[in-house]
A protein has these predicted regions:
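A long, amphipathic alpha-helix that forms part
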Residues: 238-252, 259-261, 268-309, 319, ...
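Active-site-proximal N-terminal segment of extracellular/periplasmic enzymes that hydrolyze or transfer
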Residues: 24-82, 93
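Active-site neighborhoods of enzymes that stabilize oxyanions during catalysis
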Residues: 160-161, 350-511, 517, 521
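C-terminal motif of bacterial Sec signal peptides marking the signal peptidase cleavage site
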Residues: 18-21
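Short, structured active-site-proximal loop/turn typified by the sulfatase FGly-forming signature C/S-X-P-X-R
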Residues: 63-117, 174-176
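Bacterial N-terminal signal peptides that target proteins for export
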Residues: 2-10
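His/Asp/Glu-rich, glycine-adjacent segments
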Residues: 26-27, 106-107, 112-273, 429, ...
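Acidic/histidine-rich catalytic neighborhood
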Residues: 304-305, 313-366
Length: 530
């Protein structure tokens, strides 16, 4: 491989970290100050809604950061409002799927974004919105760029499922998206593609997308002209907390803040992946960025009086054991009876299995008609570290088992059993496999929050015959060149460690209908329209 190609790949990989929400440098210490005139509520007399989405924010480390005085802005908003430590995320617990749920108010069966990595039966290829460097070096870099930046929002995200930006536009209201990886709206924008990518002749110099009225996306689109300082390579091309904060503050200071602003702070996720879920540095940096946004109002008191603040995580993380051999569960040896497709070449007619690993969960596809999903499940059951193994039959029943057990649990939507969110189900078999308890036809969830609806969402998220598998806490699933986080943190599974996130609400006494990310969109629309 020539040096020029190596440099290009390195740069493209840097841009692909946009989706992963990885670490960027940010040396500025941000302190509370009163330097700008206060901003009042919008022309209709209603408070604008500002959503701060902090990647991999979790309750326990947040509480610890507050106790140590390292998160004063979040502490201030918490003290001025409401705090909910355990809000249920989407599944898989990967940012692209969760953000699609946040924006559409649906699970993956309706929004059709299955995970960070999945296989398209229609295109006969893997879809990667970004992933580890080893994995990415084996695939088409420019295709990953196109999938992550364009296809995700304009093609893969179900057009029949409206985003919050689209619904607001339909009502004549405005919104903003700042560094959010899912942003589809109704206003056309031209994303400026870096020259080293546009020169490939496969990617246009300007990429036309639809988003909200105000769209900011790292080096590809900025609101604040001075924010170029935060877009160099070593700052992940602008996919960092400081960039997000500066663009949000710019809207406030210029009195252009729309009805709803969704701002994404990515850096905590990478620090949690590397240092483990108990690290506090990422929370401290996110809080410093939040201070920048609050300061744009002149004072924090003015900020709370003149806006509704929603600060939340998207997924949790589970600590990964620090011994590589013990911590990783390689799926390939379990399925060595089959011909498994290779990452670095197109799927061949003789291939039988495709593996799409998403950290602590994976989709395992049977792409050959002679492969029975039930046989794939039996081979997977030989690994006792596998937590949930699920497949769907021809009648849309979902069957669940796990490693080293002969137990089986089956279910489908509709029926006499009602869960704590008002959803109805038909159940049979060993309920302890999904840790639910049933009493008088009422379902209570255990360590897998909202497991029936979330798993059903993934099992019906896209075309194809596939098995969904998750791994127990402490472990990660790997396929060919999958990224690992040995001694750090990982997410992706249905387990509560991956699935529960905190929510801070300030500026309103209301809350979502249920404490699930899937219900936050409708609540925000109510706040804007009431």
């Amino acid at each position: 491989m020539g040096m020029k190609n190596k440099v290009t790949i390195a740069l493209v990989l840097g841009l692909l970290l946009l989706v992963l929400g990885c670490r960027a440098d940010s040396s500025q210490q941000l302190k509370q100050q009163s330097v700008k005139p206060p901003i009042t509520v919008n022309q209709m007399g209603k408070k604008p809604v500002i959503v701060i989405l902090i990647d991999s924010l979790m309750d326990k480390p947040l509480q610890e950061a507050i106790q140590e005085g390292r998160a004063p802005a979040m502490q201030y908003l918490l003290n001025q409002g409401q705090y909910f430590p355990h809000v249920v995320s989407s599944f898989p617990t990967m940012s692209v799927t969760i953000d699609s749920t946040l924006l559409t108010g649906t699970y993956a069966d309706q929004h059709h974004v299955p995970g960070l990595v999945w296989y398209s039966n229609q295109k006969k290829r893997m879809i990667l919105y970004g992933n580890g460097a080893k994995e990415a070096l084996k695939i088409d870099q420019l295709q990953v760029f196109l999938d992550a930046i364009y296809q995700l929002n304009q093609v893969h995200l179900n057009k029949k499922t409206k985003t919050i930006h689209e619904e607001l536009a339909d009502k004549g209201k405005e919104s903003a998206s700042i560094n959010a990886i899912v942003f589809r709206g109704k206003t056309k924008h031209a994303l400026k593609v870096p020259d080293f990518i546009a020169n490939s002749n496969r990617v246009p110099e300007k990429m036309i997308v639809t988003g909200p009225k105000w769209l900011s996306y790292a080096a590809l689109a900025q609101l604040n002209p001075k924010n170029n300082w935060n877009t160099p390579l070593w700052k992940k091309f602008g996919m960092n907390d400081e960039f997000s904060a500066k663009d949000a503050a710019f809207l406030i200071s210029q009195k252009k803040l729309p009805d709803v602003t969704i701002t994404y702070f990515p850096e905590n996720d990478n620090l949690a992946h590397r240092k483990g879920p108990t690290q506090l540095k990422g929370i401290e940096k996110a809080d410093q960025a939040l201070q920048t946004v609050l300061n744009a109002y002149g004072s924090w008191e003015q900020a709370v009086n003149n806006a509704i603040w929603i600060v939340m995580g998207d997924s949790g993380q589970s600590a990964v054991y620090d011994d590589r051999q013990a911590a990783t569960v390689d799926i390939r040896p379990l399925l060595n009876h089959y011909r498994i497709a290779k990452l670095n070449q197109p799927v061949r007619t003789e291939d039988q299995i495709v593996i799409a690993a998403n950290e602590r969960m994976a989709y395992i596809y049977a792409i050959n008609d002679n492969v029975e999903l039930s046989d794939v499940v039996k081979f997977l059951q030989n690994e006792d570290k596998l937590d949930i193994i699920a497949m769907k039959d021809g009648k849309n029943n979902i069957h669940v088992t796990k490693g080293k057990t002969g137990k089986l649990f089956s279910y489908h939507p509709g029926g006499k059993f009602i869960d704590e969110y008002g959803q109805s189900w038909t159940l049979s078999g060993e309920e302890d496999l999904v840790d639910i308890k049933v009493n008088n036809n009422r379902i209570k969830y255990g360590k897998y929050p909202d497991v029936l609806a979330r798993l059903h969402g993934a099992m019906n998220s896209h075309e194809g015959r596939y098995v969904v598998v998750t791994v127990q806490p402490g472990y990660e699933l790997v396929g060919e060149s999958s990224p690992t986080h040995i001694g750090g943190g990982a997410h992706g599974s249905l387990h509560e460690k991956d699935s529960l996130v905190p929510l801070i609400i300030s500026g309103t006494n209301t809350r979502p209908k249920t404490l699930r990310i899937v219900d936050i969109k409708d609540w925000i629309l109510q706040l804007v329209n009431e």
